[in-house]
């Protein structure tokens, strides 16, 4: 019976998987949204307009940010700090053994469900998300708080396969940020820590691109950890929105970051709109409410009950109230940093120490002296009047379906098919069916509450008929005893709903389905049990009062006299206790809803790494070279002269002949902005060097020695701290030349090389509307080639895209640390920070 009821109540939730419209409704500062199947009906223009307005209001609170909105993409092991030196994020590629993430993914995929609870972070569409471990369940209809999630309870044996990943992640956290690991480890209650780690909870997301948000409820003095377990995709970087930086992540990568900073995911980088992709990620954190007094008291209550029942399998004899710190659930303060290619490179863990100090010094100099930045890279960090930013109407919306405004305020949808479904299933709330699911005490409470309300409705209806014998519609008095009896019946029904579902929480579609069935049951009772006319009560009126109950009931309670408020609270407690005493009918997740055993840590088992021949978590963490103090601390001071080599493409004997440029909106966008016009009118930047000499020219700038040389020239066997390859690859042809160019010049850098190039891809390439993208692709190469030719006096130009350039970098034996985007650059310039791969 329980399976049958749960199946019925979930039928409408399954509609979210069907093709249809994305539905948005902002309410109480949170955007509630779900997918609605339209059954082929037409949406009028007014509804579309209202829906669009509702969506725009929604994304004001949780906006999406694209890759183009950020300046830096980190790829290698990175430690990113704010202006005060506090670590904001630590990216560690290939941090987790693949066997551990694979084992965990096989289990945690089962924890993922389509839920509307986080739809505000997904642009209004219900994403696939779930939780595992332990949770406090504050603000949910689940009456038993501070315990295992339903997933963990139901998958005890399988849960053990997650432990290696937990151990590896915890060890990495401890090695990188030991002070915060210790604070978090000391605070998390032992009864809710996952396998000895400082984590209490996992959030698992599948194919989930989040809008900008902070993780409310995480421990303030700790860090969250994000790991990608499996997937085939590009893009979806984790972005720190207030800092303009992104962390590129692929399976087995780990990111430790301050979850109280606003963060989001950038767009999926897919060549085709309907490309197949998948991504399963996991966030590890300590849910701070689990260490607060209400939860500690719940642990103690369960432990006391277990001792009274003389349980022999207790994992704890007492519960300690630990110092949980102050958890404000407020966003972290933002201390912005100015971004340059040098500060970008200084965040690379491989360049820590002396190299980072030099890079920080160079960063300070170019921020103070804009002309030095131009001397080094050929253009400033940002150009205000360069390539214009894309207008919103040029970009594909995050969710492409038409947005239809629906009003969900706690009741149910009154569409015909939904009402018919509710009427067909109303008998599931008949007494004989409920007795198969719940204990006698709870069913009696339901029966008494139902009977009491019907009696008051009958009395009120008879009075109304006496006053007006022709009356056909029931008039609902909000201040009557009948209204309060209805609220009482709703309290009972809400507990009934909890018992009918096996999920940890009831999503909006499931809740709508239940309340629709509840209303149909009551409407039928009004007709067949107390003799009201068909439609006298009606589904619409009951729906209005259900919305009143769900969103106005608390207000009405506050308006009641104190003694009535207390009576209502006692009544609700009585209902909850009756449910707790209900017998267990089967071994499904309904057991979890009523489970109040002291079963903390009963699933925990040791992992024998030696027997399995797996690398230990401690040895795995040592691979990344974190010192005992972790990644804290500032770099040392840069002393002595810093040497920089700038390599320029050699100009040809004449500038490229002016060719006929295309005329289109996209061509004008590239060629007619003021910065582009200046390039066309200015002298080529590489004309100053003597083309007859193959030797370098030296420029001194304080304690910075800058040598300049043409590609193909000689530096006399010198090595340099840093090499800047300025638009060299665009002057090469084929596959072999760019690789040879990269190998030659990167080999002269002690620390790293900046590969500066034109990027043929529009910064919004993957989300441009098709007609805009096609127009851009038709003109971009010829337009940027003309600008490049004017800047470097070249008659042969081979511009490339970022994916092509990344391929060259990899094949040349170099490692990519990061990518820096020059904002507004008329050449759409990017700088790749690369270093020679360690042998």
Swiss-Prot record:
GO MF terms held by the record: DNA binding; DNA translocase activity; ferrous iron binding; thymine dioxygenase activity
Location (main, coarse): nucleus
Gene3D superfamilies the record matches: 3.60.130.30, JBP1, DNA-binding domain
UniProt keywords, alphabetically: Dioxygenase, DNA-binding, Iron, Metal-binding, Nucleus, Oxidoreductase
Names of required cofactors: Fe(2+)
Positions that bind 2-oxoglutarate: 279
Cofactor binding summary note: Binds 1 Fe(2+) ion per subunit.
Phenotypic consequence of gene deletion: Does not affect growth, gene expression or the stability of some repetitive DNA sequences. The genome contains only about 5% of the wild-type level of J in their DNA. Cells lacking both JBP1 and JBP2 show a complete absence of base J.
Catalytic activities: thymine + 2-oxoglutarate + O2 = 5-hydroxymethyluracil + succinate + CO2
Binding site for Fe cation: 213, 215, 263
Pfam families: DB_JBP1, Tet_JBP
Keyword Acetylation: no
Domain-level remarks: The DNA-binding JBP1 domain (DB-JBP1) is necessary and sufficient for binding to J-DNA.
Function as written in the Swiss-Prot or TrEMBL entry: Dioxygenase that catalyzes the first step of DNA base J (beta-d-glucosyl-HOMedU) biosynthesis by converting thymine to 5-hydroxymethyluracil (HOMedU). DNA base J is a hypermodified thymidine residue found in the genome of kinetoplastid parasites, which is localized primarily to repetitive DNA, namely the telomeres, and is implicated in the regulation of antigenic variation. Also specifically binds to base J-containing DNA (J-DNA).
Similarity remark: Belongs to the TET family. JBP1 subfamily.
Protein's name in the database: Thymine dioxygenase JBP1
